[in-house]
């Protein structure tokens, strides 16, 4: 079922594109010589909610859980807010509707977000931000466990498996 959802909604390419546009807009809106120190897909896998969180401060990125300067970037930038509302919200509503019938959706949702982070890394989206901490996380999640899951997806990608 998840494969059908991915194919029909183009979930991963959509999220990747929205993330790239959000990162670009955040860089323009909050220019700084400092690189981003932390990036997260901050989400609720139960409901399909997804936010991008950012910080430029390494100490904040290193906290458990990280303390984001910008907890919900797409809500802070009006043009990006509209973009997310127009493009992501219909997919989220479909996810919420289908999730009730498919117990595996929340874990598949998280795994797809991890795949997108790895794809963004591979594309060089985070190259201007050396040492950036990357996460796919939920509120009150164990960030160490979440990072371990991201490492597994990253390793699969490096071994030639589709991330």
Could you describe each region identified by the protein language model?
Residues 26-64:
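N-terminal interaction modules that seed assembly of large macromolecular complexes
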Residues 45, 63, 93, 105-106, ...:
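Generic detector of bulky aromatic hydrophobic side chains
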Residues 48-100, 141-163:
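Intrinsically disordered, low-complexity regulatory segments enriched in Ser/Thr/Pro
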Residues 1-16, 20, 24-31, 35, ...:
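Acidic, proline/glycine-rich low-complexity IDRs
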Residues 27, 38, 84, 88, ...:
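Short linear motifs embedded in intrinsically disordered, proline/glycine-rich low-complexity segments
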